[in-house]
Amino acid sequence: MRYLIGMCLLLVMSFPLHAQERWDDEFQMLRPECSVMETSLLGEVRLAPRRVGSQATAPLKAKGVQKVPVVLVAFADQGFSVADTNEGVIEYYQKFCNGTKDGHIYTGHGSHGSIRDFFVEQSDSVFLPEFVVIGPVVLDNDFSYYGANKYRYRVKVGDQIVTKDKVEEGDVVVDSILSQRDVNYSKFASESIAKAMEVFSDWSQFDNDGNNTIDMVFFVFAGFGENFSGANSNYIWPKEVTKSETINGRVFATNAVTCEMRPASKKDDVIIGKPDGVGVFIHELSHALGLPDFYDTENVAFGMDVWSVMDYGEYGNNGYNPGNYTAYERDFMGWRKLVDLTEPCVLTIPCFADGGVGYKIQNAASANEYYIIENRQQRGWDDYIGRMGHGLQVTHVDFDASTWNRNRVNSTADHQRMTIIAANDCYKGTNSAESATEWRATLAGNLFPGDTYNFNLTDETTPAATVYTGGLLHKPLRNITENEDGTVTVCFMTNGQLDAPLLREPENIMMDQFDIEWETVDHATQYAYEVIRDGAVIQEGVVEEASVHVEGLLPSSELEFHVKAMADQPEDYIDSSWSESQYFSTLADYIDELPESEKLVNVYSSNGVWMTHCYVDQIHRLSFRSGIYILRYSNGASRKVLIK
């Protein structure tokens, strides 16, 4: 669960997009609410070992129908606010989690869609979660009993600083260190499950893989969560916990928790809330599916920021519109696999909503290090994120199983293992931006070409295509272009693709031969051609000139001819596609009587010498000697005729 800087960026994002002048003021006003102690000492919760890093070992599988219980939990001093009655609360969360299942995205709760809507779309309907809402149950104690934190204190004693578990009268406290968050969270989980089992009996349906274990349980508790800065430190911190619990004879493999409300505004030091969006729920459920966090758990480096729901992307539009899974995350789940790029090519990539995939560029010096390229546009679940920036996202991955399993993917600032290559070479993210304006300016230029119009990523550009093993990738991306239809075109290991030649009409068509020419193509050194009959290639070759003489054909053959331009080195240019074809027929090997026709034809002697052009029915008026002549029609057809 990523800590939200102050409510700072959260509230800034909630303002109308035209209110540019307010962003810096609001950012600075709220920044004091960002507790330095909290943002720098999140160690235990954020770094707690999780069974993440592999879908194969995840508690919840990412394919097929998976049933998940969602337990609504109120406290002795805090009830739900999304509705006035328990029935209303249940109905709200039924749709919040499951939507309507009628093929239409459910937006009635203010989010871009329901939890189920998100995962069905991201998985191409491979993963079909079904959420069973239970409760609300009411716990025996106040929220502070379950959410209180434990601190250690550094106290000045004489000239020394000592660490104590408890502050005594007269102690001079230098600072405090968070040693444990939500000290009674285990009691929260076990009590919530026990009370839920009193009102709901059929828990066997949540053992999706038949291993006699409930795969997971998700809690939604009433009120705010501690993840929003300025919040009460006694609130529970949303998270996913991989800790087996046995309650009433049932084994629960893991649980996750999120809050009902989020801060919407602040007045006279009182935070006014509204129902939270789907973002945090999606983030925590993704942990149960095996994904680690992609933010820097030390709150220093850029990580993935808004470009992943496993980082700040869960808070898109204040959590109401988290972004799409990245191409890496969809590949991780086995939903839409990455395509390996190994040969020079020119790609035109749609965004995910339009069927696009991600492409993997392997570092030849390391099997675990690679780039992923994908197209992010303001479409589908990227509708809000796409307002921040759009274009080609280049993600640098340096996989290490141990780092993934320990949930420390981006915890080393100078060796981030899952982060973007920013087109503007700027990484002022939520951890380091001094203002909302600076943060948004960074995002606007992160993707290629971005607002800095960076069309290339090579070993020599800024930024350069660097890797940890080997120094440089040596696989350039050039001419990165966003097209009007929302696709992105990129040249991989090449300057581009040659234009297809423009064919002229064939000439000198005889029974067994013809000539044909085409326009020359810049940077082409050769041309490949094919002669096709009945769908099969009957002749092919390569020539250096923009013309070819073809012979050895059969009479009366209906032919297709096309050509493509070729370059010497694919790293300079790659071959063109095939040209548009010319269709025509060779001459027949029989002689027709002079036809009656008013069509204009060219008349040739039997050895191919042009004689004249006229209408067919006028030929008998001309002073031709008796003999065989060839009539060639404007559509390329020819025939032999006998003039007596």
Language-model features: where?
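C-terminal tail/sorting-segment detector
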Residues: A19, L587-Y590, S626-K644
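Active-site-proximal segments of metallohydrolase catalytic domains
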Residues: V52-L60, H109-V251
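Residue-level detector of functionally pivotal "anchor" positions at catalytic/ligand-binding pockets or at interdomain
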Residues: N495-I509, S581-N607
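Non-catalytic C-terminal accessory/binding modules of secreted extracellular proteins
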Residues: E21-R31, S81-Y145, Y151-R152, S229-I271, ...
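Conserved aromatic anchor
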Residues: D512-A524
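Extracellular fibronectin type III
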Residues: P555, D568-L587
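Active-site recognition of the HExxH zinc-binding catalytic motif
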Residues: F219, G279-D293, I373
